[in-house]
A protein has these predicted regions:
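Glycine-rich phosphate-binding loops that contact phosphosugars or nucleotide phosphates
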Residues: 98-216
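Short, hydrophobic-biased amphipathic alpha-helical segments
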Residues: 74, 216-220
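HTH-adjacent hinge/linker in prokaryotic transcriptional regulators
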Residues: 12-13, 17-88
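Glycine-rich phosphate/diphosphate-binding loops that line cofactor/substrate pockets in enzymes
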Residues: 89-100
């Protein structure tokens, strides 16, 4: 199913039934569902941990259990990121970061907050990293970018409309761009030159989502 085209699935079930099923699971449609399924299958092959990445602790857990689960989750996320890391891709990403005079971060909500840590680390080594919190500011930023800029676009699903809109502007202007996204086909990777993949243990629509995997990828990029 994860590798099946929508047209193949629709031969066995009506399109309306498939869409209803996907939306019942809180996905926008079949493609979103397929991306999440492929990502989760990839994670399942690599992970032996019983910790739920979306809800790593319960209200009844002790302080030690909470701290231990978060520590183990962060370690596992970094380990899985390293296992999945394409070293040649990382080398090319680092070259792009080194060459750029200005690095612009694009995304919404949580990933932007985590990107602030990356911004601070890069500031310490003399790199100009800019983060606009408002979507309209990001679109203006994309429209004003030059060849001296590098765009890093963060979207776990690779289908975040605001990020896709910025990616299209950057693509038309031929601005170098890197995607940070989950495994599987998605629209975002079509508009970027390089891709770094996230650990897929955190589901797209989770309440405690993507903090450890995004942070680990930022950290890997910073330290190489």
């Amino acid at each position: 199913l994860a590798s099946s085209a929508a047209s193949d699935v629709y031969k066995r079930q009506s399109p309306a039934s498939i869409v209803r099923f996907c939306r019942k699971l809180e996905y926008e449609g079949y493609n979103d569902f397929k991306i999440a399924l492929a990502a989760q299958l990839q994670y399942s092959r690599l992970s032996n941990d019983d910790i739920n990445a979306n809800y790593p602790f319960k209200g009844t857990d002790s302080v030690y259990t909470v701290a231990s689960n978060i520590a183990n989750l962060s370690k596992e996320s970094i380990d899985i990121t390293m296992k999945n890391l394409d070293l040649e891709e990382l080398r090319l990403v680092v070259l792009m970061i080194t060459k750029a005079k200005v690095i612009d971060i694009y995304g919404v909500s949580g990933p932007l907050r985590i990107a602030s840590d990356f911004q601070y680390k890069m500031f310490r080594i003399g790199k100009d990293v800019r983060i606009s919190q408002m979507i309209n500011e990001q679109l203006f930023q994309a429209a004003q970018s030059t060849s001296e800029h590098l765009a890093i676009l963060i979207s776990y699903s690779g289908e975040t409309e605001e990020v896709i809109e910025a990616a299209k502007i950057l693509y038309r202007r031929k601005i170098p761009a890197i995607a940070i996204t989950s495994f599987g086909e998605n629209r975002l990777v079509k508009y970027t030159q390089r891709v770094l993949y996230l650990n897929s243990s955190e589901f797209i629509y989770s309440k405690i989502a993507t903090f450890s995997s995004t942070l680990s990828l930022h950290s890997v990029s910073y330290t190489h």
